[in-house]
Amino acid sequence: KELYDIFFQMRLDHPEIFWAVGFSWKYYPDSPNLIFVPEYLFEKGKIKEHQTAMTSRVEKIARQAQGLSEWEKEKYVHDFICQNVHYDKLKKAYSHEIIGPLGQGVGVCEGIAKAVKVLLDALGVWCVIAICGNNPEKGIKYRHTWNIVRIGGAYYHLDATFDNTLGKSDKVEDIRYDYFN
């Protein structure tokens, strides 16, 4: 359980490590070591190729917001997601990672929150990923993921998924800000 918790938290803190989506482990009674065996989203040989593509994509997107204030950077990332990412109702595996929203233009809340974090990290804006669990007693069937950002020393919640899925439009004037700060 402890190894799972560490791996899970590492993936939230570093969503740029999008290719390792799980793990198994081996333990031999005669050895003091635990063997960690990562599970990959795609073939191990393709990791470097996808990593290079994602790094370039993040740099290209972030470059356009350099020199803006923290709030303007947050809004830029929010608007980019709302204009360029569609919610993946099929919930493909890559939609849970940055490669879905930033590479394929589709994502679920987890992938969208990870993409927001990676972009804000690249822009120097403090950001973490927040998760709420399901609660069948209150009718909440699924877990949800969003971001918490620090702008001007104050903390705000940012949910680009909900703003994205509430009113889908490609027009800048139609972007919703119901879950923006």
Regions found by a protein language model. Give the residues of each.
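Linear, non-domain "peripheral" regions
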Residues: 1-56
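Secondary-structure boundary elements
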Residues: 42-101
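Conserved active-site-adjacent core of cysteine acyl-enzyme catalytic domains
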Residues: 93-103, 107, 111-118
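Hydrophobic/aromatic-rich core segments of domains that either
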Residues: 111-181
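Short, well-ordered strand-loop elements centered on a beta-strand within folded domains, enriched
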Residues: 34-38, 100, 104-106, 154-160
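A generic structural signal for nonpolar/aromatic side chains embedded in well-ordered alpha-helices
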Residues: 10, 81, 101-102, 180
